[in-house]
Amino acid sequence: MSKEKRRVPKLRFPGFTEDWEQRELAELCNVYDGTHQTPRYTNSGVMFVSVENIKTLESDKYISEDDFKNEFKIFPEFGDILLTRIGDVGSANIILDNIKRAYYVSLALLKPKGVNSLFLLALLSSASVQSEIWKRTLHIAFPKKINKNEISKVIVSKPSILEQKKIGELIYALDQIITLHQQEPFLCENSVNDGVELC
């Protein structure tokens, strides 16, 4: 097979030579969307997240335990991924705790099956997958959106599970370093007040 036809990245970890396989996203994860009902907010209970919470996965909005049990038979768990699908389309984050969360229809829930969660997160941010998401987004809608079934049809490429693990862990670590450096100006400005030299 010629190099032009092989599905392999230009850069990869040593020891891996196999072609990457093309799959629809539905083969790598189950895709769900959040509640379509207007939430009945409470002062405490189960955290309720929406598209604006994708960066931190934290919110000061809550719904009752009863509403959560009634409306969320399937909910985000450790290792799952939330993906924005209305307004802001295609931003993703991974659940790395055991906090209960309810989520709105503006988010899609991706439950990985047979794929490394961190690799899937990295894959969703890649240029090729973002292009696939962009092509399947309804840009004439206001706000723009991608339907749940279209997310499932997004074409992705995947290597062996061992290579997935290495790639996912590396890219996640790099993302954490980048985030830390982006916060440094804020930390430097506040270090004098706290009496701690951070810079």
Where are these regions (language model features)?
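Short sequence segments immediately N-terminal to proteolytic processing junctions that release a mature
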Residues: 20-23, 167, 178
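DNA target-recognition domains and sequence-specific DNA-contacting regions of bacterial/archaeal
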Residues: 26-158
